[in-house]
């Protein structure tokens, strides 16, 4: 229902605007409304599709019936072109001048940093020092010659056989009652002499080698 009411109102308003426009152009009096009526019918059909969008303008149609609405559109088109052009040009000029003055002083500091790069060049000479390390690898090869050293251990087995062979002796069985060998004294005297020598050797070993005091000897 609202759409139908809106369409009826819009069609009435459009017919009224069409009558005003036709009369103003032709200069006809207000009584000649019968001649302007037939051309308004096809215009209503074309605007029937747009009536849905003009529903909000139903209240404002009372104020827009005045004819000076056309020149207002012309005045707005001229103002938009003039406002956009001038502000863009002066802003670009101001920014270009300021950037050139501020960037000039930091260029001098960059020149000082280039001098420091020369100090890093001697570090490149330290790299060839790593090459002599390759010659250290053949030092591991002589370790292979250490393996045949384990083979001579097999020759230690025949040494045990030599200890088992008893040597013949011309003396009789040892003991205090046995007879002495040729060129030797009595065994009783030899025992006393040998025991004395052993005691003297022990004393010298404790005193000189072990460092024991005299009262412990």
UniProtKB/Swiss-Prot annotation:
Quick one: where's region Disordered? 45-163
Instruction: List the protein's name.
Output: Salivary glue protein Sgs-3
* Keyword tags: Repeat, Signal
Q: Does the keyword Signal apply?
A: yes
Q: Where is the composition biased (Basic residues)?
A: 131-154
Signal peptide start-end: 1-23
Bias (Low complexity):
45-130
């Amino acid at each position: 229902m609202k759409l139908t009411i809106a369409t009826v109102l819009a069609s009435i308003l459009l017919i009224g605007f069409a009558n005003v426009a036709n009369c103003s152009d032709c200069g006809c009096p207000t009584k000649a409304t019968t001649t302007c009526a037939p051309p308004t019918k096809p215009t209503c059909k074309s605007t029937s599709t747009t009536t849905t969008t003009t529903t909000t303008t139903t209240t404002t149609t009372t104020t827009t019936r005045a004819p000076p609405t056309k020149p207002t559109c012309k005045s707005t088109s001229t103002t938009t072109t003039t406002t956009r052009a001038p502000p863009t040009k002066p802003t670009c000029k101001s920014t270009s001048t300021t950037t050139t003055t501020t960037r000039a002083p930091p260029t001098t500091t960059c020149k000082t940093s280039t001098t420091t790069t020369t100090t890093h060049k001697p570090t490149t000479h330290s790299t060839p020092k790593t090459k002599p390390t390759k010659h250290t690898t053949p030092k591991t090869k002589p370790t292979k010659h250490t393996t045949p050293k384990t083979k001579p251990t097999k020759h230690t087995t025949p040494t045990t056989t030599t200890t088992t062979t008893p040597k013949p002796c011309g003396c009789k069985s040892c003991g205090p009652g046995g007879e002495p060998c040729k060129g030797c004294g009595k065994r009783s005297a030899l025992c006393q002499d040998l025991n004395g020598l052993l005691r003297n050797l022990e004393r010298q070993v404790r005193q000189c080698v072990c460092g024991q005091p005299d009262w412990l000897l």
